Regions:
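N-terminal export signals
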Residues: 1, 6-23
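Glycine-rich, aromatic-flanked loop segments that form ligand/cofactor-binding clefts
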Residues: 96-123, 143-166, 187, 195-211
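Second-shell residues forming the walls of enzyme active-site clefts
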Residues: 83-95, 189-342, 348-349
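Short, acidic/polar
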Residues: 55-66, 139-146, 236-238, 305-309
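Glycine-rich anion/phosphate-binding loops
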Residues: 84-88, 133-145, 188
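Conserved, mostly hydrophobic/aromatic
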Residues: 75, 107, 150, 292, ...
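N-terminal hydrophobic targeting/anchoring segments and the immediately downstream early-domain regions
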Residues: 22-118, 321-322
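Mid-to-C-terminal alpha-helical segments outside catalytic/metal-binding sites
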Residues: 338, 344-371
Length: 371
């Protein structure tokens, strides 16, 4: 059994002497990606948001052009993009035509975080806490219906489920009933059932928010959140159980600081100690990593977009989410290539790291394809 001493020792070792992060990735895939143009490697890691809620929205023009040129690998839909069924499905069709294999990502947890709502004609998904009270047998067909509807609407990535532990005093999750339980075994069982329903439709599920956001005090949408005093290793347990159950193929890290896990004070999103040292080396995760939105206050208030994007890639993230709505930049995808190029020259990022990210995205897509 892994002890706290073992884990902390591994984190220190990871920071002092970074090891290869490509365990389990095919050597031929890594070699192939390492020879691809940098623009293609970077573009595939980017999932950008936009302004607009209809297919003819000006913000959709730049997204369509970026998709068609391979400058981005996917599109993030937020609440302001999903106001009507006709609008959101029309946008999804437009983007899918531009890039058939692109990730179209949206939050469809249920409860207060359900972008395709009942008012728009989709099935209402109760909040996780309410679902848990009704039991798995009642929830399973609801998850299956929600997954079919999401696919029919044009999406292939759900930024859910929540694998955090319930704590009523939590500002971002607990007070809204977004977590299934305070028990790690129950949380893992519920998340596995949720994932099964969506993956059966070929939809990727981003399990969030590693290493656990449930007992935090503060909301990283608004600003800096330090979990050093509140976090325990129990909060990482649901993520570990999902790995052992074979359900963890895409995971989202949190914009949280834990000085016990990273004494440098880097948020998890930018911390190699946590994403590589804890998650991959200690816990054995071999799936893909996706950031939470880098435009959230916890990141935006402390780092430039260049620092956040290149730092997130260097830390071990394979997909980068940027809503691009707080300060919209139609040239963000092009700038990202320049930023990564500068990081490569500076030695803070490597082509090998980009190749690893692309190889993991290959594996994620292959997992979701019908047998």
């Amino acid at each position: 059994m892994l002890t706290r001493r073992h884990i902390m020792g591994a984190l220190a070792a990871s920071a002092a002497a970074p090891a290869a992060a490509n365990a389990g990735l095919p050597a031929d895939a890594l070699a192939r990606h390492a020879l691809r143009p940098m623009e293609a490697l970077v573009g595939r890691t980017l999932i950008l948001g936009f302004l607009g809620d209809a297919p003819d929205a000006p913000g959709a023009d730049a997204i369509e052009a970026d998709l068609a040129a391979g400058r981005i690998g996917g599109v993030l839909f937020l609440r302001h993009n999903a106001r009507t069924r006709e609008g959101v499905e029309g946008l999804a069709r437009r983007f899918r035509e531009a890039a058939p294999d692109a990730w179209l990502a949206i939050d469809q947890e249920g409860g207060v975080v359900q972008r395709l709502t009942g008012d728009m004609g989709y099935t209402r998904i109760p909040r996780a806490q309410a679902l848990a009270e009704g039991g798995l047998d009642a929830a399973r067909p609801l998850f299956e219906t929600a997954a079919r509807e999401l696919l029919e609407a044009g999406f292939n990535m759900n930024l859910a489920p929540i694998a955090d532990l319930h704590d009523a005093g939590n500002d971002a999750i607990g007070q809204y009933g977004r977590a299934f339980s305070a028990d790690s075994r129950d949380v893992a069982q519920w998340c596995a059932t949720f994932i099964d329903a969506f993956e059966a439709q070929g939809i990727a599920c981003a399990i969030k928010h590693f290493p656990g956001h449930g007992r935090s005090r503060g909301d990283s949408h608004d600003g800096y959140v330090d979990i050093t005093a509140t976090w325990t290793f129990e909060e990482a347990a649901p993520f570990g159980r999902l790995m052992r159950l074979g359900r963890a193929h895409l995971m989202m890290g949190a914009h949280l600081v834990n000085l016990r896990l990273d004494p440098d004070g880097l948020p998890v999103t930018l911390s190699r100690r946590v994403l590589h040292g804890l998650l991959r080396e200690v816990m054995g995760y071999d799936g893909a990593m996706i950031t939470d939105d880098l435009d959230m206050g916890a990141i935006r208030n402390h780092y430039s977009r260049e620092q956040a994007l290149t730092g997130a890639l260097a830390a071990g993230n394979d997909l980068i989410l940027i809503s691009n709505s707080a300060n919209p930049d139609p040239d963000l995808a092009r700038r990202a290539v320049d930023w990564v190029g500068a990081a490569l020259v500076a030695g803070t990022l490597s082509v090998q790291r980009l190749a690893e990210a692309n190889a993991r995205l290959d594996a994620l897509a292959a997992h979701l394809r019908p047998a």
